[in-house]
Amino acid sequence: MSTSIPPHPLFLLGLMASLVSACASPPEVAVTTAAPPLVLESFFPGRTVGQGVFTNSWTGSQRRFDVVIDGSWDGRTLTLVEDFAYADGEKDRKTWRFERTASGTYKGVREDVVGEARAWTEGKTVRLDYAVSLGGWTVDFADVLALREDGSLLNKATVGKWGIRIGRVELELRRAPSS
C-alpha cells in the first residue's frame, strides 16, 4: 500500500501566486527597431478604423468587432469617440478623454471606466491600465499599443478579474483614407 504525501501548504500558495501573476501580466507586443514610437496625440486625430476580437480565456469563444474612431486633440485633451459594430449585430459608442499630465503620461476617463485610466509611454509603446464596469462586474484591462512599420497600430489587452486573466483583446487600427 502506498501513501502519498500531501503538498506543503506554502508550496501550494507559491504555485497559486505564480499562476495568478502569470495570468494577470500585461500582453507583450513585438516592436521592431524600424517602427516609430507611438505618440497618442499624433496618431489619433482624424478618423481611424479597425478590426478586433475578444477571446474568452476559459472557453476560447470569440467575439469579433469593427470600430471607427473619430479623434481630436486640442493641445491638452485627446478625445476619442469610438463606434463599435459587433459581428452579432450589437452597436456601442464609447468616448475617451485623455488629458496629458506630463510628457508621455496621461489620465483618461470614459463613461464605463471606474475611476481614471492611466496611460504612459514605455519605450516605443504606450501602456494603458483601467477598470471597466460590465454588467455589475468590474474587470481590469491592461493594454499595450504599438505602431508597426506599415503605420498601423496594434493594441493587445489582457482582461482580468481578481488578478486572473479572463480574456484578451487584439485590435488592429489604421488611419482612414482622407476623403
Spell out what each predicted region is.
Residues 51-134, 138-142, 176:
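Central antiparallel beta-sheet cores of small beta-barrel/beta-sandwich binding domains
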Residues 19-22:
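C-terminal motif of bacterial Sec signal peptides marking the signal peptidase cleavage site
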Residues 28-30:
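Extracellular beta-rich ligand/substrate-recognition surface
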Residues 44-52, 155:
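A short, Trp-centered hydrophobic/proline-enriched beta-strand micro-motif
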Residues 24-26:
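Bacterial signal peptide processing site
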Residues 2-12:
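Bacterial N-terminal signal peptides that target proteins for export
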Residues 142-154, 158-179:
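Edge beta-strand at a domain terminus
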Residues 32-47:
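N-terminal helix-cap/turn-to-beta initiation motif at the start of protein domains
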